[in-house]
Amino acid sequence: MAKGQSLQDPFLNALRRERVPVSIYLVNGIKLQGQVESFDQFVILLKNTVSQMVYKHAISTVVPARPFNVSSHHNTPNQAAGYNASHDDSAE
């Protein structure tokens, strides 16, 4: 698994699993809202009244509408509202 996805996948999976409403801001400033229906290495399926396939390279920020629990690959729960990567190996 790529280093960048060690945070990305658990974060997006928790959003999907808990059906947390999100605002996704694109690099061009457009704001999309909905729930993460599915995702892979390159895209996120965002569901609102319709499903939209959003390419990850076009995303600037993903903002959850409420706090939720994220389980990292170490199986330690993190609070998403204060989620930090202090255990990131690149800092060592």
UniProtKB/Swiss-Prot annotation:
Gene3D superfamilies: 2.30.30.100
One MF term in the entry's GO annotations: RNA binding
Domain Sm: 9-68
InterPro entries: Hfq, LSM_dom_sf, Sm
RNA-binding keyword on record: yes
Disulfide bridge map: none
Gene Ontology process terms (BP): regulation of DNA-templated transcription; regulation of RNA stability; regulation of translation, ncRNA-mediated
A Gene Ontology term for the protein's cellular component: cytosol
Keywords: RNA-binding, Stress response
Annotated region described as Disordered, given as residue ranges: 68-92
Classification via Pfam families: Hfq
Polar residues composition-biased segments: 69-81
Family: Belongs to the Hfq family.
UniProt function note: RNA chaperone that binds small regulatory RNA (sRNAs) and mRNAs to facilitate mRNA translational regulation in response to envelope stress, environmental stress and changes in metabolite concentrations. Also binds with high specificity to tRNAs.
Quaternary state and interactors: Homohexamer.
Name this polypeptide is given: RNA-binding protein Hfq
